[in-house]
């Protein structure tokens, strides 16, 4: 993989959020979809992190943080606060030529 061909942090967040929006209705409880849509402007956010260690239970490849990121999407207590109600954890490959993502949805 090429370090010079990676998505920026903003591009990674945007791509993960777009994927979340496309798939949320099919994977979240309808009440959670309504809550997220009503509260996102006031309390919503997406946070970029290195992949958590528990992803190893879900995927069978090396999660080098130079090429993979975890994006938490959900609601915080207030605008700008850390996300406390996680609706999705998106594992995404940051290499532009390698489209790959996995999502763990709120249960």
Swiss-Prot record:
InterPro entries (UniProt xref): dsDNA_mimic_put, Put_dsDNA_mimic_sf
Gene3D superfamilies recorded: dsDNA mimic, putative
Any Pfam family: DUF440
SUPFAM superfamilies the UniProt entry points to: Putative dsDNA mimic
Disulfide bonds listed in the record: none
Domain of life: Bacteria
Functional description taken from the UniProt entry: May act as a double-stranded DNA (dsDNA) mimic. Probably regulates the activity of a dsDNA-binding protein.
NCBIfam families hit by this protein: PRK05094.1
Family statement: Belongs to the putative dsDNA mimic protein family.
Name assigned to this protein: Putative double-stranded DNA mimic protein ETA_15890
Organism: Erwinia tasmaniensis (strain DSM 17950 / CFBP 7177 / CIP 109463 / NCPPB 4357 / Et1/99)
């Amino acid at each position: 993989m090429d370090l010079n061909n990676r998505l920026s942090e903003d591009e990674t967040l945007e791509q993960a959020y777009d994927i979340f929006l496309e798939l949320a209705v099919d994977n979240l409880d309808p009440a959670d979809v309504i809550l997220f849509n009503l509260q996102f402007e006031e309390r919503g956010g997406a946070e970029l992190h290195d992949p958590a260690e528990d992803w190893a239970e879900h995927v069978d490849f090396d999660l080098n943080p130079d090429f993979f990121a975890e994006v938490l999407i959900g609601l915080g207590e207030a605008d700008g606060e850390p996300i406390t109600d996680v609706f999705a954890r998106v594992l995404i490959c940051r290499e532009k030529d390698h489209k790959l993502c996995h999502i763990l949805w709120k249960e």
